[in-house]
């Protein structure tokens, strides 16, 4: 029985079979958690879907893990700052409305 995608095809995409297993497991967990798929799948199982994405080249190992972690931290920080700015604007709007309401009375 021939499995698709084949291990030979997949090993052309990643440096070692150990890296392949880790990448597949991480991507399968992401898909299970609701991550957006990068393509239409033939397979139903998330583990096989992850292999399909790896085979097509849509999912790769980041060449510099430290840079990836830094990018993730920067994105999280930017999201936090955006939320804080939005909260500040809402509080300012509420204060302005209360002030206008006080002038009307």
Curated annotation (Swiss-Prot):
It holds the Pfam family RNA_pol_Rpb6. Gene3D superfamilies: 3.90.940.10. InterPro entries: DNA-dir_RNA_pol_omega, Pol_omega/Rpo6/RPB6, RPB6/omega-like_sf. Coiled coil: none annotated. Keywords: DNA-directed RNA polymerase, Nucleotidyltransferase, Transcription, Transferase. It is an enzyme of class 2 (transferase). One of its GO terms (cellular component) is DNA-directed RNA polymerase complex. It catalyses: RNA(n) + a ribonucleoside 5'-triphosphate = RNA(n+1) + diphosphate. Its EC number is 2.7.7.6. The RNAP catalytic core consists of 2 alpha, 1 beta, 1 beta' and 1 omega subunit. When a sigma factor is associated with the core the holoenzyme is formed, which can initiate transcription. Promotes RNA polymerase assembly. Latches the N- and C-terminal regions of the beta' subunit thereby facilitating its interaction with the beta and alpha subunits. This is DNA-directed RNA polymerase subunit omega.
């Amino acid at each position: 029985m021939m499995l698709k995608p084949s291990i030979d095809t997949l090993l052309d995409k990643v440096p070692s079979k150990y890296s392949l297993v880790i990448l597949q497991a991480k991507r399968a967990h992401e898909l299970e958690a609701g991550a957006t798929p990068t393509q239409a799948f033939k397979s139903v199982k998330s583990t096989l879907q992850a292999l399909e994405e790896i085979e097509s080249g849509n999912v790769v190992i980041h060449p510099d893990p430290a840079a990836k972690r830094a990018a993730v931290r920067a994105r999280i920080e930017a999201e936090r700052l955006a939320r804080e700015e939005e909260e500040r604007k809402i509080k300012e709007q509420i204060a302005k409305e209360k002030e206008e309401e006080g002038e009307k009375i």
